[in-house]
């Protein structure tokens, strides 16, 4: 049970005890209550007049905690959000082995996180762009994020930027240095003030990252935000908190392995009407503990997890799952013919041990999550399946 749920249970127990005491002896209960109020009032008066500095410290503490329990880790002042009267939609688009997440916020804004298929499949690309056109009807995207430089997250992004006007682009703190001379010349021709933002020593030499990089920095009037530290997209009714590598983490990291390249993925927590959705990119055992440390407390009671790195064995660690305490999981993957053998059996077993409800794009197609005005979660899937959703790609191959 999470700390938040434990606190709630404790409060309910206390309420029951008060009611029981009142029923047993109403007169004594009332006299005792009045006496307690008088004692508290006298104590407050003494502190206020005799110890003004102590009073100021107490008031500052109350203001800082926003009246809440600092150990009840509800995110960034989670209780301060107003209830929204619209729908939040999150579309986990089936792109095979890759990621593409379209978020439709209740205020009419949109966000796209990654857009790619590992094999740069032209048919999947067209289908994905057609899908986006169905929901983005004003030729404009408010927020676009690329979590990291892998091709199965970036292949279609330059086409998206060409097709839509993008207001804000969130991207890795990594300079493109393509081996292709023509592309390198295009990188060199980009606005110097934008290129100067990329001071980290790491670079990416792939063609696909260079094409995205050039498109992003060439997008007219787009604000470029680097995935560094913590930042939020916030309104009165929803908040999207992102936890990324801090500046010193970037400085102390070299992208010498696939695991290190994946670990730069931001972990985002989107909250609306009392529900929290965790989006992870290809996060893994390297940056998941960093997220836990950054959030702090004993846990962050969440509802839905987009499983990191397509269900890789090194993602969704036991510690991470215990910390976020989700009831639902979504995996974007293509188990059939997938040389990476994602999702892995060990990862699925960890999710199953938590009694999660699981959705997989390889079996269910595109998965759409809706949080409505009442805070109710609903999932719809493109297709149904009779396959064993808890069988990993590695297990299926072994049974082959």
Predicted regions and their residues:
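Core dinuclear metal-dependent hydrolase active-site scaffold
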Residues: 32, 51-140, 214-301, 365-400
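Active-site metal-binding motif and surrounding structural segment of the metallo-beta-lactamase
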Residues: 106-111, 118-179, 294-312, 325-330
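Charged, glycine-enriched surface loops/patches
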Residues: 195-199, 207, 211-217, 344-376
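Long, structured stretches of catalytic cores involved in phosphate-ester chemistry, encompassing
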Residues: 184, 296-366
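Active-site environment of divalent metal-dependent phosphoester hydrolases
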Residues: 97-99, 149-155, 176-179, 284-290, ...
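Metal-dependent catalytic neighborhoods of phosphoester/phosphodiester hydrolases
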Residues: 151-163, 179-191, 317-321, 343-345
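Gram-positive cell-envelope targeting signals
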Residues: 1-79, 169, 369
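Surface-exposed intrinsically disordered loops and tails
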Residues: 181-225, 249-254, 290
